[in-house]
A protein has these predicted regions:
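Contiguous, well-ordered beta-strand patches that form the walls/edges
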Residues: 69-166, 209-217, 222-225
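Acidic, glycine-anchored loop motifs typical of Ca2+
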Residues: 51, 56-58
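Short, exposed beta-strand-loop hairpins at the edges of beta-sheets
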Residues: 160-161, 168-182
Length: 225
């Protein structure tokens, strides 16, 4: 008989370790969903120049106005080119950042709206500049509702990162306003979560009356609220 010794050489490339700022955006899963914050997800304010005032999720220094809930974005189509709804004005819209540097915005149905490349520049978690933590730059206006307030439909591609954790992100567009000059700026507040949008519908909490006992009456219709 014959004996065949078959060998095959495999080239294994270890995954590149992600930078800290990329881990925040895409997680160690390599992709991550971001949605509108529950309040103040889009609005405007004055450029007060103090980045430290952006000290929590949805907290905007110099805030003048913001949508009370994401549903309010449907009333802000005057800032969109042509005033046309594209789907990201819906409360359930979301965007996905991936480790290969692509961000895609989606309608609540999962249909893609727009996509582009992204990168984080000059990330400085110490905020040495006194203002931003870094810049989030996209190749085109690809984020959720990326329109400058009172900008005549101007799409934003360079954002100042003001608050940045795995759970929440606040972005600002200054439109060249002088720091501390109180000129109008636009802000966006997002929350981050699972790599799967279907798992981000809400947070599980206990109901105040959520634990107890009772008799098995057999009427499922009695569980009506």
């Amino acid at each position: 008989g014959t004996f065949t010794d078959a060998t095959k050489t495999l080239k294994c490339t270890p995954p590149t370790e992600l930078a800290p700022e990329m881990l925040i955006l895409v997680s160690d899963n390599g992709k991550k969903v971001w949605k509108y914050a529950a309040t103040n997800s889009y609005g405007n304010g004055g450029h007060g120049g103090a980045g430290a005032d952006f000290n929590g999720p949805g907290v905007v220094g110099g805030n003048w106005w913001g949508v009370e809930t994401p549903d309010g974005l449907a009333d802000q189509l005057g800032h969109v080119p042509g005033g046309t709804a594209t789907g990201d004005e819906a409360a359930g819209a979301y965007m996905v950042f991936t480790e290969d540097g692509v961000v895609t915005s989606y309608k609540p149905t999962g249909e893609a709206i727009r996509s582009g490349k992204f990168e984080v520049k000059n990330y400085d978690p110490e905020r040495s500049s006194g203002w931003e933590l870094g810049k989030l730059v996209t190749s085109e206006p690809a984020l959720l509702f990326p329109w400058m307030i009172n900008g005549g439909g101007k799409g934003v591609t360079e954002f100042d990162i003001m608050y940045f954790t795995p759970q929440a992100m606040t972005l600002v567009y200054t439109n060249g306003q002088a720091s501390g000059g109180w000129g109008e700026i636009t802000h966006w507040c997002f929350i981050g979560g699972s790599p799967d949008p279907l798992t981000m519908e809400g947070t599980w909490t206990y109901d105040a009356n959520g634990y107890g006992k009772g008799g098995h009456g057999g009427a499922g219709a009695d569980f009506n609220g």
